[in-house]
């Protein structure tokens, strides 16, 4: 039984922490791997450093680098795992590019979708968990968080509000594969809600 499950959300949604907690619960009963974008494979991790830790760059260059990392990650890690019947939990995927580069950066959602369609070759997630948090709460968490801030963390509040608007538009248009989880709750509640959502999906396939 294979399943491709992605996690999406704005900065400060707690997404990376939630996916880690959910993974450690699922791995007790399922053949599951956890990975991330950009990154997940050596080439992808190098691209991650460029786009998240480097200086400002042309927005289309940024979009193309994310797509290139995505392709390499799919070919080397995600597709082989799915062929082996694994459950793949992925921290970000195509919807991040649509919301961040397509919507918030202003390139255009359909333009970025076309670029990423070439990269993913039709491989959309079976289920996408969207961790729903307001831009204000997300920003507060980023400021309080001890981790180093990347280029996206450092964008202003207006940018993060546009990211959320982008996600809302995507979810409206593709509601069949999205499940929204209230990420304004305490972390343990977010983890539990996310875990139960995934379990319900896996029990049906």
From Swiss-Prot:
Keywords for this protein: ATP-binding, Kinase, Nucleotide biosynthesis, Nucleotide-binding, Transferase
The positions annotated for binding ATP are 9-16
Residue pairs linked by disulfide bridges in the UniProt entry: none
Q: One GO BP annotation here?
A: dTDP biosynthetic process
Single GO MF descriptor: ATP binding
Q: Which InterPro entries match?
A: P-loop_NTPase, Thymidylate_kin-like_dom, Thymidylate_kin_CS, Thymidylate_kinase
Report if keyword Chloroplast is assigned: no
Question: What Pfam families does the database record attribute to this sequence?
Answer: Thymidylate_kin
Q: Which reaction does it catalyse?
A: dTMP + ATP = dTDP + ADP
Q: Which GO terms describe its cellular component?
A: cytosol
The Enzyme Commission number assigned here is 2.7.4.9
Is Mitochondrion given among the entry's keywords?
A: no
Reading the lineage from the top rank, the first entry is: Bacteria
Family to which this protein belongs? Belongs to the thymidylate kinase family.
Main function: Phosphorylation of dTMP to form dTDP in both de novo and salvage pathways of dTTP synthesis.
How is this protein named in the record? Answer: Thymidylate kinase
Taxon lineage = Bacteria, Bacillati, Bacillota, Bacilli, Bacillales
Q: What gene is it encoded by? A: tmk
